[in-house]
Amino acid sequence: MKMNLDDQLKGEDETLDTFYHGRIRVFQKKKGYRFSIDAPLLADFVQTKETDQILELGTGNGILSLLLSIKPFAHLTALEIQASLADLAQRNVRLNNCEDRIKVVRTDLRFFSVGKKYDVVFSNPPYIKQKAGHLSPSGEKSVAKHELKCTIFDIMQRTEESLKRQGEAYFVYPAIRKEDFMRAIHDTRLKVRNIRYVFPYRDSEPNFFLVSCDFSTREVQLLRPLVLYEREGEYTKETQDIFSGRIHDPTD
């Protein structure tokens, strides 16, 4: 019996999940790295144009690049250091018929040779400091979430080197580590353009923030906050729209 493409590409230890009402399909490890809520939020936050050349620093299973594929751009290069995740990301790109728009490169982003500059650079960086927090039994998940292979300072340095003069970079990062993020920015020529705090509930503290950076902004714009839940188990209308893949400008 002839196997369909899903069966050919899917590993035994993986699940097949759908997003944006089935427009995007992604294989994920059952016990290894699985993306979290910050991925679709960052994909929504990134703004693109049809001619954009884009670079992702640390793609994991490719989820962010694939969610971004519903937006216009010319080509996206996605870097991933872990062989298992790079392979998974490549299979996910093929699963979604995006081979002509997205290229996965297995490499250490700290030593990636930038042969050109990019219009857009984005990243959902590892956010747990070395020697802080509990390491997952899954080495794959630990490298994705802990600063074992690169730090926020490495991410910012590579972004500075990769971004065009008129380009823009986008990140999502824990609010508790904002000071580290700002120090990493200040070590480069990058400047914070927009910040949007993400709150679980209206009366809670932010758990992370979305931020855009460029080389020319003189004043930071604080965007209206994003609240995820109306109440426990019920997303706000905006969160539902983001999870459905509705394209909009978060700066509006």
Describe every region a protein language model picked out.
Residues D7-K49:
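Class I SAM-dependent transferase core
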Residues Y33-F35, G60-N61, D203-S204:
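Short glycine/threonine-rich catalytic loop with a Thr-x-Gly-x-Asp
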Residues D44-K116, V120-H134:
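Conserved SAM/SAH cofactor-binding pocket of Class I
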Residues P125-D154:
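Mobile active-site "lid"/loop adjacent to the S-adenosyl-L-methionine
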Residues E205-D252:
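SAM/dcSAM-binding transferase cores
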